[in-house]
Amino acid sequence: YAASLAENVALSENTDKSRAADALCESGLYRKGTSVPVEKQVLREFCEDGFLFSEGQKQKIALARACYYNTEFLIADEAAASLDPFAEDAFNKTLLQGHPDQGVLVISHRLSVTALTDRIYVMEHGRITECGSHQELLARKGRYWQMWEKQRRGYA
């Protein structure tokens, strides 16, 4: 529906615009004072002069929703898959460190996020094959270590 960016973050017409702007700033999508006000921004598919967002920007909107609602638990499935490495790093830090009282389950093939987590479960063919912290799994030099090394070397 034709809604402002703030309303798309809150998923409601009864939006706390200041809180939505704070959540969008936290997600890295918006800067107060330098961007069009969030209550004026409308997605292009709904308005001729609206904005057309990239997949990465859409992922930041999803993170802004998580920041806006600050639920007790969040599931993030490939949440940063469309972001460049710098945006991904900032996104992951916000996701995992921005709300310390929030539990987060991260599902990802990109292992840069796993180093920030408390516990990692490696799954192969529907089964958990390894479990531990980032450092513990690297020290074991098992499947997680193999995947980490492959990504660290740039899939060379």
Regions picked out by a protein language model, each given a short descriptive name:
Residues L63, F91, I107:
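Hydrophobic anchor residue at the start of the ABC signature
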Residues Y30-I61, N70-E72, G154-Y155:
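ABC-fold ATPase nucleotide-binding domain signature/coupling loops
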Residues S35-P37, K93, R110, A115-A156:
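C-terminal portion of ABC ATPase nucleotide-binding domains
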Residues A6-E48, N92-K93, D101:
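ABC ATPase nucleotide-binding domain helical subdomain, centered on the C-loop/LSGGQ "ABC signature"
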Residues D101-S108:
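Conserved H-loop
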Residues L74-E78:
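Catalytic Walker B motif of ABC-type/P-loop ATPase nucleotide-binding domains
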